[in-house]
Amino acid sequence: MEGTNNTTGWTHFDSTSNRTSKSFDEEVKLSYQVVTSFLLGALILCSIFGNACVVAAIALERSLQNVANYLIGSLAVTDLMVSVLVLPMAALYQVLNRWTLGQIPCDIFISLDMLCCTSSILHLCVIALDRYWAITEPIDYMKKRTPRRAAVLISVTWLVGFSISIPPMLIMRSQPSSMAEDRANSKQCKITQDPWYTIYSTFGAFYIPLTLMLVLYGRIFKAARFRIRRTVRKTEKKKVSDTCLALSPAMFHRKTPGDAHGKSWKRSVEPRPLPNVNGAVKHAGEGESLDIIEVQSNSRCNLPLPNTPGTVPLFENRHEKATETKRKIALARERKTVKTLGIIMGTFILCWLPFFIVALVMPFCQESCFMPHWLKDVINWLGYSNSLLNPIIYAYFNKDFQSAFKKIIKCHFCRA
């Protein structure tokens, strides 16, 4: 989004020879143009390829054709429009360090820039909203999660984008002051610096969606953590509860040392239920030995030996390790959720927050605020790079998309 003047400041060195100074400046400018053209060209091509692969994967792979992926596909189409319609003109403006296409193409460029970038940001907000509904209202929302609903959400993103991008072209440009400014700065192509429009556009395109995304993903994390922990608790409760046999020493009778089977205890058992005990006990007849085949328990029965007062331990806790393992798995899932949400929000904020801070602040302090032109350019292209990163975050990390991409690369769909 061209919120600032896209010009690059170069340092000129004084020299006794004007020719030497001019030659040095041309060499620096040529090297800058070559390096910049290569970097921006690579960014544009990678962005086009990545988003085109996402669109092709959803169109060709039936397993990917669901509402959640339709939203991701629409995001890819929007970022593809940014890559094809906006970035080439922005790159030309950046490399030449001046606008050479005229005023009407400048107006079209600014409108497309704001429309596509705003729609891309709002798509991220819609995807967050869809995920929030899916995880907080899984049963009810599954009935409402239809392609028609997805189409409505996508339409809203474009309508909001139009409401933000059209005013600069149709309203602001018709003002006499704006026309006079355009004639005075024919080599520049920048958005209007009107303070009221700046507040309206920056809050509508970024700050409100950012706030909504932070709230939604915060609640998604809380809901996901609650469901993970509830699943672990349910798994523990579903374990079959058996009986931990509490035995009193007075109920036992030791056989004489001469008995063939050595020491054993006479069967006199009082069953007492304890939580989470799984086991199999072979009950012997009167005068026979009592054999314990296998016992598993989630809570250790710390029972004393027969020659001490109290009850006698017959069972070992075999499920403690399993329970601890499940807790570790649950913790790993929570960490993965935090990592995923952190990547989504971190990338979005890193790419767009610097740009919108500059876009909001600079119109109010044009004379007192100073920022190097190179820093403005870096911030500007950092925002554009979000169109390259979106397909990586939302699609390439998805295993279903990965298999579809492999088919596309191997031209599996072509043979089919």
UniProtKB/Swiss-Prot annotation:
Motif (DRY motif): 130-132
This protein's record includes keyword Transmembrane helix: yes
Residue spans, topological domain Extracellular: 1-35, 96-104, 172-195, 365-372
Compartment(s) where it occurs, according to its Swiss-Prot or TrEMBL record: Cell membrane
Glycan attachment positions: N5, N6, N18
Keywords: Behavior, Cell membrane, Disulfide bond, G-protein coupled receptor, Glycoprotein, Membrane, Receptor, Transducer, Transmembrane, Transmembrane helix
Alphabetical GO biological process terms: adenylate cyclase-activating adrenergic receptor signaling pathway; adenylate cyclase-inhibiting serotonin receptor signaling pathway; positive regulation of MAPK cascade; regulation of behavior; regulation of hormone secretion; regulation of vasoconstriction; serotonin receptor signaling pathway
A Pfam match: 7tm_1
PROSITE patterns: G_PROTEIN_RECEP_F1_1, G_PROTEIN_RECEP_F1_2
Function summary: G-protein coupled receptor for 5-hydroxytryptamine (serotonin). Also functions as a receptor for various drugs and psychoactive substances. Ligand binding causes a conformation change that triggers signaling via guanine nucleotide-binding proteins (G proteins) and modulates the activity of downstream effectors, such as adenylate cyclase.
PANTHER family from the UniProt entry: 5-HYDROXYTRYPTAMINE RECEPTOR 1A, ADRENERGIC RECEPTOR-RELATED G-PROTEIN COUPLED RECEPTOR
Entry's family note: Belongs to the G-protein coupled receptor 1 family. 5-hydroxytryptamine receptor subfamily.
Name of this chain's protein: 5-hydroxytryptamine receptor 1A-beta
Species annotation: Takifugu rubripes (Japanese pufferfish)
Upper classification of the organism: Eukaryota, Metazoa, Chordata, Craniata, Vertebrata
Gene transcribed to yield this protein: htr1a-B
